[in-house]
Structures are given as C-alpha cells and as structure tokens.
Curated annotation (Swiss-Prot):
Keyword Acyltransferase: yes
Lineage of the species this protein comes from: Bacteria, Bacillati, Bacillota, Bacilli, Lactobacillales
Protein name listed in UniProt: tRNA N6-adenosine threonylcarbamoyltransferase
Transmembrane segment boundaries: none
Family, similarity comment: Belongs to the KAE1 / TsaD family.
Purpose of the protein: Required for the formation of a threonylcarbamoyl group on adenosine at position 37 (t(6)A37) in tRNAs that read codons beginning with adenine. Is involved in the transfer of the threonylcarbamoyl moiety of threonylcarbamoyl-AMP (TC-AMP) to the N6 group of A37, together with TsaE and TsaB. TsaD likely plays a direct catalytic role in this reaction.
Domain of life according to the entry: Bacteria
Length: 336
C-alpha cells in the first residue's frame, strides 16, 4: 500500500507550526516557530502581533517540515488544519496556507478542532482505547471530555469562568513573573510551602464544573493587602499555595468524572499537562485507570497533534471545501 503523508497546520494562537505524519502514526517532523519573546513585554498574546508573525514564518515552516520529513510536496496525500477555536486572525493565516497547498496539489483538506488536537496528541504515546475520558487543561480551556470513539467528543464538565492556564498567567503577572508564567510557578511551588488557605471553588458540589476566578481574586487580594501593609510575601510560598488549590480542584473533579464515567483510560492534555505538580498528583492518586499524558513537546500548541487528530476525520472522509472558514469559538458538543 502506498504511504500516506498528512501535512498539518496549527496557527490558533502564538505558535506557527507545520508537521508531517506518515501512515497515521509516525510523526516525521513537527516544526514550531514560537512568538513568546515578542509577546512577553505585553504580558500576554497580542492578536495583531500574532497574525503578523504567522504570515512572516508560515512558508519557511512548510519548507522545513517537508525537508525534515524527507518528502517532496508531491508526496503529500492530504492537508490538515486547525480551524478553531483560537484567535481569528491567527487561524486565518494557517487556513490560507493549508487551503492554498490543498488546492495547488488537488488533495483533500481536513478540518481539525484545536482541542481535539490536544487530546489526540496522546496517540503519540500508545494507541488509544475507547471509550476514554480526557482532562484538557490549557490557557483557554479547562474541560472534561468523554470520547466514545476517535472523533466523537462530548464535554461532560468545564470551567464557568477562567481557564486554569489563564489563572496561572494572571497570578504570575501579580508576582512579577514573565509571561507565560505556568512553568515558573510550577518550579517555585516545588520550593515553597502550602501555607495560604486559598478557596477551592465548587470542590464539594456534585457536578463536574470548574471555577478559578475566586481563587485568582483571593490570590490578588492577599498580594495587594500585603503590599499595602509593606509586607513581603514569598513567591515560593504563594506559588505552592496557589498550585495546591488548583490541583485539589482538578483532581477532585477528575475523580468525580471517573466515577460517573467508568473508563479504562484517562488522557490529560493541553499546555498545563506539562505541569510537574499535576503529573505528580495524577501518578499518586489515579490508580485503577491508565493515565496517558503526551510528551512535553506535544503538550503546547503544535501541528503534530493536529495531524494525529486528523486521522479519524480522514477515515470518516470528513473533508472540507476551500470555503472552510475560521471558527474562533468552536467547541465540542456538550453531553446531554
């Protein structure tokens, strides 16, 4: 059988990425051009700046991905692209590049949900067994997803306000840390003590919903009040206390979901899945279910994960026309 090569594009936020996947499982290349340095001084992602950067580097990323994979343009069998959720201007750059490539080579265009990409990055670890449950934790999302089969995603619980990654970046800014702050808070937390009693919102409620706005506000108020009194607080202790509260919430809701939906596999994915504290808690507390976390290089935004997620869409012949548009608010369906 002839080899199949998927060329995948990811430009939903501040990473320009192009990857090549061979025969559904072998990731030959995964080129990522990060813009973090450009956004650091603003303390967050500036959509206009992100879009301009994507335009500047997308062509080079395509060339590098093909070269690294050792294939020519003519060998590409299909093109996969993130069409949402994300920043509309950023998404449009990837869509324009993907559609142009698909049109020029007369090959199928596969639309991929960015969050399905995060989830299916777990395929790089081992073949996934369905049904499974996924905890998706990133800068823009915190959700529990039931996956009955590849490509069939249903939200069973999500945040009512801030995403967990967003909360990390906001408290990081209060502590004077550079953006993005998640990794640094994780490191500081391992050096400090959990000595501040931050709220664990909705932790005892009988649902699978999350809330991080109260925790974020309590953190900001504590820090502000200490500054007003001229007291110096330890960033290590603040980080340890904040992270302990976050992990308590994530673990409580995940355990509750596993009770309600008895599956054999739990996938934990998204940028926050790189957090060492979260990985430690999962290893210590989730015993009877196989926990699969993508490798660190596939936790953040990347096109490799989009390629993995596109396989089930390809197998279902779920192709898009060249009129495919960006859907910045795209979301999985909610379980009824």
């Amino acid at each position: 059988m002839k080899d199949r090569y998927i060329l995948a594009f990811e430009t939903s936020c501040d990473e320009t990425s192009v990857a090549v996947l061979k025969n559904e499982t072998e990731l030959l290349s995964n080129v990522i051009a990060s813009q973090i340095e450009s956004h650091k001084r603003f303390g967050g992602v500036v959509p206009e700046v992100a879009s301009r950067h994507h335009v500047e580097v997308i062509t080079v990323c395509i060339e590098e991905a093909l070269a690294e994979a050792g294939i020519s343009e003519e060998q590409v069998t299909a093109v996969a692209v993130t069409y949402g959720p994300g920043l509309v201007g950023a998404l449009l750059v990837g869509l324009a590049a993907a559609k142009s490539f698909a049109w020029a080579h007369d090959i199928p265009l596969i639309p991929v949900n960015h969050m399905a990409g995060h989830l299916m990055a777990a395929q790089s670890v081992e073949p996934l067994e369905f049904p499974l449950l996924a905890l998706l934790v990133s800068g823009g999302h915190t959700e529990l997803v039931y996956v009955s089969q590849a490509g069939d995603y249903k939200i069973v619980g999500e945040t009512r306000d801030d995403a967990v990654g967003e909360a990390y970046d906001k408290v990081g800014r209060v502590m004077g840390l550079t953006y993005p702050a998640g990794r640094e808070i994780d490191q500081l937390a391992h050096q400090g003590r959990d000595m501040y009693d931050f709220p664990r919102a909705m932790i005892k409620e009988d649902n699978l919903e999350f809330s991080f706005s109260g925790l974020k506000s309590a953190f900001i108020n504590l820090h502000h009040n200490a500054q007003q009194k001229g007291e110096a607080l330890s960033n290590q202790d603040l980080s340890a206390s904040f992270q302990a509260a976050v992990m308590d919430i994530l673990m409580a809701k995940t355990k509750k979901a596993l009770e309600k939906y008895p599956v054999k596999t739990l996938v934990v994915a998204g940028g926050v899945a790189a957090n060492q504290g979260l990985r430690e808690r999962l290893a210590a507390e989730i015993q009877d279910v196989k926990v699969i976390i993508p490798p660190l290089r596939l936790c953040g935004d990347n096109a490799g994960m989009i390629a993995y997620a596109s396989v089930s869409e390809w197998n279902k012949k779920n192709f898009a026309g060249l009129d495919l548009n960006a859907k910045p608010s795209l979301a999985f369906e909610t379980m009824e």
